[in-house]
């Protein structure tokens, strides 16, 4: 029987001039193959006023997680009035604990173009935990992460 395991969605930062520290990483369950788990969890992006952000509408929802074969798809719902997301580049940074405690070379940036975005985490099977070059797709872009992939298994 397959062990249940979790994936951690990395910390979220907004980076117009530099990295703005965000809230803690979010742990999400991994569905069985073919299963969809409805999450509907709101994630607030913490901003520093010194960077010119206000505290309004700086959030998005994780709608659901779907698994197909060994791929995980996370559906994100961005508020249409989310000024920070619309104006800025959203930086997803892989932080300590996932990739050997270093985030160097493990970040990707995209500009949100519409309300919905899809995060594809590709091939997250236990057999690939310590392999390199795990791929993550975000909306219209793809970024190859250089491991080791340190998924938390429970």
Where do the model's predicted regions map?
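Alpha-helical, hydrophobic structural elements that either
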Residues: 1-154
